[in-house]
Amino acid sequence: MLPPFFDVLSKYSRRGNLQFSCPGHQGGQYFMKHPAGRAMYEYFGENIFKSDICNADVDLGDLLIHEGPAMSAQTYAAKVYNADKTYFVMNGTSTSNSVVINAIVSPGDLVLFDRNNHKSIYNSALVSSAGKPIYLETARNPFGFIGGIDAHCFNEEYLRSEAAKIDSEKAKEKRPFRLAVIQLGTYDGTIYNARQVVNKVGHLCDYILFDSAWVGYEQFIPMMRECSPLLLDLKPEDPGILVTQSIHKQQAGFSQTSQIHKKDSHLKGQKRYVDHKRFNNAYMLYASTSPFYPLFAALDVNARMQDGEAGRKLWADCIKVGVEARKDILERCELLKPFIPPVVDGKL
């Protein structure tokens, strides 16, 4: 029933090992020496303190080089999410985006840049990594919602002409763009068809990063299948796919739990391929050597919850609740109206 890392962590914490290195609270004992600390201990419960253990303990594997139960957890998550590799990140998707872009983009590389991108992508792609942006214009719909990228921005001739303004030589290359960064789902809920994005611009890019901070559930809902970059059938001429997800936003995770999915095995042997060693060097640049194991365990458990038919039923139930809530609002409310089409399947 339990996934690999959480299973080992829960058994380990029950053993009650003494820790002579760190954390200094020693399984919560230090907190118990003061009324404020005792109140905190009793509020959170003993297991959260017993699960906060030193990263030097070999029983749970190394989270930085990905071995043991830690590696098993990420391998399991990759299987659940249809990725080639998955990396658990414990300081948010701002960090996940920084890891990806640091691994992919070098100074002077051209980056196709969605104007809806999160600030972390601006900071990592354009400042830290010194990429050169070709901005993809975005729009708002009549309701003021943050919409998608304007259609003309997916035209190859237009993109090459914009790239030529920045770097005339790269604009002529078969793949002028090292990376495209697309917000798969905007803050207001506009979601792309990932297949269409890849069909339109994939042949121009080495990699596409889909920032999925506000989504991540699309591949578990049949009607949203085409929105999932991780369900694409990729060939050697396709771009590598990278997906970052804020598990704490729409799935089961503590705040700051995030993950990176890497789907690029179809690029192996090509010059543009980024291997695990290079990618993990970027990962370690942003990872702490003192990880909080309950965060890692939450990512592990989240993958278990999404797995198989049980996970799909959770999302089917969620969709049903959303539909019924809209019906109730339409029937009972005068001042509130959900944003739905006036006609669905020919019915008003």
Q: What residues fall within each predicted segment?
A:
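Short acidic/polar alpha-helix capping motifs at helix-coil junctions
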Residues: A36-E42, K85-F88, E162
